[in-house]
């Protein structure tokens, strides 16, 4: 009798998952990362929807990650710090500045708006940026950031440039080939006081 109940429960769970449109053992985040690297927005969006449904139906304690943000953050990390020899910390620091800007009262509140702001990053409808296919390392850095991991842990760091900006340099990253990248604090640090 116990064996029949186990088989029946397994069959019901499988049928429930199949009706739901997701597979319980599929790693949809891995599919999202693959889609980012392949430049396949439709596949990534579909995987994100299935992942969100799986998290909700199975009551999993996973952070929600929007595919649009994973897509854009992976691309900007690749554009700004995609060189294969640059360490993961550098890639994540670049991405964290974008997230800090999204949370800042000084900048727009969405990733797309932050990246498309005039004079910042690559702007709107940029063929170079639009055509980028990030490396898996850049996509992984974006995933880690969107899931809450931080390397700077300083919300007031809202500038990343080849020269000093803002009120202070928080961190200078140096590379023999690329030179220095400065991660700088806002000109209005009082906005970030806890």
Predicted regions and their residues:
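Gram-positive cell-envelope targeting signals
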Residues: 1-47, 55-60, 80
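Bacterial extracytoplasmic/cell-wall-associated proteins, especially those involved in peptidoglycan
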Residues: 37, 44-194
């Amino acid at each position: 009798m116990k064996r029949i109940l186990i088989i029946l429960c397994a069959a019901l769970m499988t049928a429930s998952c199949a009706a739901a449109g997701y597979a319980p053992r599929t790693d949809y985040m891995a599919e999202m990362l693959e889609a980012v690297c392949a430049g396949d927005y439709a596949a990534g969006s579909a995987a994100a929807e299935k992942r969100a449904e799986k998290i909700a139906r199975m009551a999993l304690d996973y952070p929600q990650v929007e595919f649009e943000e994973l897509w854009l953050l992976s691309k900007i990390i690749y554009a700004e710090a995609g060189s294969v020899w640059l360490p993961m910390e550098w890639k994540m620091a670049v991405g964290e500045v974008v997230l800090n800007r999204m949370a800042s009262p000084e900048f727009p509140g969405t990733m797309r708006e932050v990246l498309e702001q005039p004079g910042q990053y690559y702007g709107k409808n940029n063929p170079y940026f639009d055509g980028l296919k990030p490396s898996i390392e850049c996509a992984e850095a974006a995933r880690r950031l969107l899931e809450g991991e931080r390397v700077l842990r300083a919300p007031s760091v809202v500038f990343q440039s080849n020269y000093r900006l803002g009120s202070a340099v928080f961190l200078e990253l140096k590379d023999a080939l690329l030179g220095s990248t400065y991660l700088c604090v806002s000109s209005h640090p009082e906005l970030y006081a806890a």
